[in-house]
Amino acid sequence: MDLEVLQRILDGREKPTNLSFELLKNITENFSHDREIGHGGFATVYKGVLPNGNVAVKRIRNSHSINEALFYREVDSLLNIEHKNVVRFLGFCASTDQTAIQIEGSKQHIYAEVRERLLCFEYISNGSLQKYIADELRGLEWNTRYEIIRGICEGLHHLHKEKQIYHMDLKPDNILLDNDMVPKITDFGLSRLDEKSKTMSEERYGSL
């Protein structure tokens, strides 16, 4: 049932919604290394395979350091964005579980909270703008360059002026290109979560 819901969301027949951790785990083959398509200091991105297409699953690391209110506020922002030059948001997962750990040399257990926070987006197969800037052999025609620049500007205008969302980390790595070389802005919400988690870590453990 969960798989069918995500398929309908990908097809545009349903709105983005809460997705189960088991679903995202299954479509990425238990977040296998072979499905990893990107990573940074904040999240690892996996390719999720569906019968009707592919998705990108961002698994946030150190989820315990993410402010819950901020996470849901960012999800709410993502749910309200729909623009051809912004990567399409498909859903989120906020799973919290308990695990029992036996104390060594004792029959007693301690219980730890296990958090999983994930975001699901459309899969963009043509890579980032950075790849084309760094590789001269890919040489883009002037008209293509112009359309990419215009698309980025239109996407930013939608975020900044219409949604009052500021990217804070715009760079070629965060501009993805689809098969028609249409630019798609990504990671605008994650940059704010990352800054918050860094602040929380510094407050708890001191600046390194």
Q: Where are these predicted regions, by residue range?
A:
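Protein kinase catalytic-loop region centered on the HRD/HxD motif
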Residues: 154-165
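Short, conserved catalytic or interaction motifs in soluble domains
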Residues: 62, 83, 161, 195-196
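Membrane-proximal cytoplasmic juxtamembrane segment of single-pass receptors
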Residues: 1-120, 126-127, 133-152, 203-204, ...
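Catalytic-loop of the protein kinase fold
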Residues: 164-178
